[in-house]
Amino acid sequence: EVKLVESGGGLVKPGGSLKLSCAASGFTFSSYAMSWVRQTPEKRLEWVASISSGGSTYYPDSVKGRFTISRDNARNILYLQMSSLRSEDTAMYYCAR
């Protein structure tokens, strides 16, 4: 059974920082590209960041330079470091395979 469990969310003031984690299990984590997506208060889904199995990273312009996706293949954890947060970053964040 594939499981992705996010943690690290919370309330942050504009300009603040937050780091999210996603613990993965049930598949060979290191073999898969992984992404973060978010659902806005208006229920719109937005792509936030992706990282390939080899570590290449991809971002939309809206978060480039502010968000950093990374992975720990030894621990099967995906990360999203968010900084310079804005009101428009308010959302529920989810990791995805």
Curated annotation (Swiss-Prot):
Single annotated GO MF: antigen binding
Any Pfam family matching the protein: V-set
Superkingdom per UniProt: Eukaryota
The Ig-like domain, residue ranges: 1-97
PROSITE patterns with a match to the protein in the record: IG_LIKE
The keyword Transmembrane belongs to this UniProt entry's keyword annotation: no
Recorded GO CC terms: extracellular region; immunoglobulin complex
UniProt keyword rRNA-binding, yes or no: no
Protein keywords: Adaptive immunity, Immunity, Immunoglobulin
Biological processes annotated in GO: immunoglobulin mediated immune response
Miscellaneous: This sequence belongs to the VH7183 subfamily.
Database matches in PANTHER family: IMMUNOGLOBULIN HEAVY CHAIN
Protein name, as recorded: Ig heavy chain V region 914
Taxonomic source organism: Mus musculus (Mouse)
